[in-house]
Amino acid sequence: MIQLLSHIPPSLKAKIPAIPPATPRNLWLLLTAAVATQNLAAFQSSQDENITVFAALIWGGALICLEDQLETLDPHPQWPGLIAGTTLLSWVIARTSIILHWDGMIFILPLIGCIALALLCEPIKGIGRFRDSLLCLLMLPAFNVVMKLIPDGPLSVLTAHLSGFWLGILGFENIVRNKTVLMPNGGVEVLPACNGVDMIAQVICIAVIFQLAFPLRSFLSRVIVFSLAPVIGLASNTIRIAILALCVANGNGKGSGLFSFFHDSIGSLVFSGISVFVFGILYMRLLERELPPLPAVLHDQTSHHE
């Protein structure tokens, strides 16, 4: 290997990134990356795209919460924590490898894996430094719980009426009967799988992650964020249902490419991304209001008053 590297031109060798040394910190980070990768691979193979992307966002949030501590990270576990962490992590890796689609354990395994990694890094009394990352990963089982707590029937009816409302604003004639949006040439029925409960739960969980990673100090701002999070998720999905109703009314019903795009996971993923993007803009605007002005701005304001 060394002889092979010696034949590489110096100009090309300079562009090859150096391999980090095998320090305890780097080995722990490598192990963390391997655990996250295996978990996301399990989500990708057993869950739909929406949940897989959400899991990736959760892991990203956990990493952001840990980012400020990376420079001072120095793994030094005690023997009880080392044994417990190794046992837990071995079980998590083995359990993740046999996950099936209906297995709810997949939502809990990331949290258990993070606890194991914390035990492999710090003494038991010191794992509090990973609190925010653990709370981020707690959003995965919380997401599953929220999806089950939100009632399907009333939400489907509300989704249908709001979809009809959007169509009415745009000038399209429609009638809403219970869960069905009817138009002159067809209509759609809002079933539990399409009522947007996943988008609502997702945006709520993203709100919690944002609050952990970039906390808002103002109580009013926090109230606004957590009040609008489910509204943004619901509104995004009702627009998607309205588009589906338009597709059916224009002869692009079930089986057509246009209907399949907006009905199946790809179109749902697009609107899920839109809801997270809109929420992110709202959150960052509120966060900017709490940040102190830049020194240059302060200087300009002082000069103006003079």
Protein language model features and the residues they cover:
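Hydrophobic N-terminal alpha-helices or hydrophobic patches in metabolic proteins across all domains
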Residues: 1-306
